[in-house]
Amino acid sequence: MTRRAPALDREGAFLLAEGNREMSNAKSKTKNTTGWKTRTKLVHEGIRRSQYGEVSEALFLTQGFVYDTAEAAEERFVSLGEDEFIYARYGNPTTRMFEDRMASLEGYEDAFACASGMAAVNGALMALLKAGDHVVSSRALFGSCLYILEEVLGRFGVEITLVDGTDLDAWRAAIRPDTALVFLESISNPTLEVIDLKAVCNLAHAVGAKVVVDNAMCTPIFSYAAEAGADLSVYSTTKHVDGQGRCLGGMICGSRDLIRGPIEAYLKHTGGAMSPFHAWVQLKSMETLDLRVRQQATTALAVADALDGHPALNAVRYPTHKAHPQYDLAKSQAEAGGTVLTIDVKGGKEACFKFLNALDIFTISNNFADAKSIVTHPATTTHQRLPQEQKDTLGITPGMVRVSLGLEDPDDLIADLRTALDAL
């Protein structure tokens, strides 16, 4: 009997040689996920089983795929089926399961997995833009996002206009009839500004511009990008999806036309695709994503409440905490404000460093959304390359600390923070 390399069946099973079909059908069946709640989708969505009927999703750690004949190889390259594969840079069964699960969680038709969050941001922007285009973006962005906008896109003749993302009038004034794309962070990193996403989407779509949202701080659990009308929702899955500081990843979610059109074409040819191993690690992490993120968000609000008014602090900021200047907007858009808060330590950099060095449980690092609680000094790390004037405009002060809450007991975290602050 001629053997054929397996291809994926959209109904949930790998297509096998004719003699093995009965076993495949017995071990994998079509699942109607309509109406399933988030936690159920995070465990079951996108699963495709091979003829072996494995319970845990399989890791296809392979660069390429086998064809029975030269004619079969030619046919595959001429007309690649939706779930057929030719090379891991173009697609992989494990990666496809991860993409399907993320798209379902986000409420989009499709998704493309990338090597990192910044590969996802770069891929989304480069795939949709050309020389001479105009982009409007919020000015409060992660340092690497600012670099891509100002240095990379600027070098290729794309005009960039940065605005105060919290000011709808500023968006209205900046978006022009020839604006091609709007880019923003739904919750800015690290300043935690909140943008009226639906209003900005309406302004952009009125002139035919695409909207790309970096949703890393919002988290996939509390995301409202699809509901608000964003064309693409971009993630660093390194953060909450992996959630344990193990491996890099990124994801672009959107319509099938955008994802399997310009996005896939750009990324598969420029090498931004995700490793199958990283896809497998993060696919498995999604099973506990809702449980982890909700606990971290609950802890973040508890910490904000506990530190609010501490004499060593100028401010505590968390989107759904009553002291946040955009509290009402944040509460109207999302169930919670994410897993990160910021504090502003009195006494500037010197006092801030003393505070950081006095912490016992918190880890000093530049990542966030880990199971371990992490503290970061943005002015000297993630945003150190920005001119001081730009830091001042954004509100990145010498005393700002980004506090990422992990899965430790909230009482222990609060005690650790208070002890370090009380010593100042």
Q: Where are the regions a protein language model picked out?
A:
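Short loop segments at secondary-structure junctions
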Residues: 64-65, 254-258, 286, 345-350
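N-terminal "arm"/small-domain region of PLP-dependent enzymes with the aminotransferase-like
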Residues: 24-92, 100
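Conserved PLP-enzyme active-site core in the AAT-like
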Residues: 32, 42-51, 111-311, 317
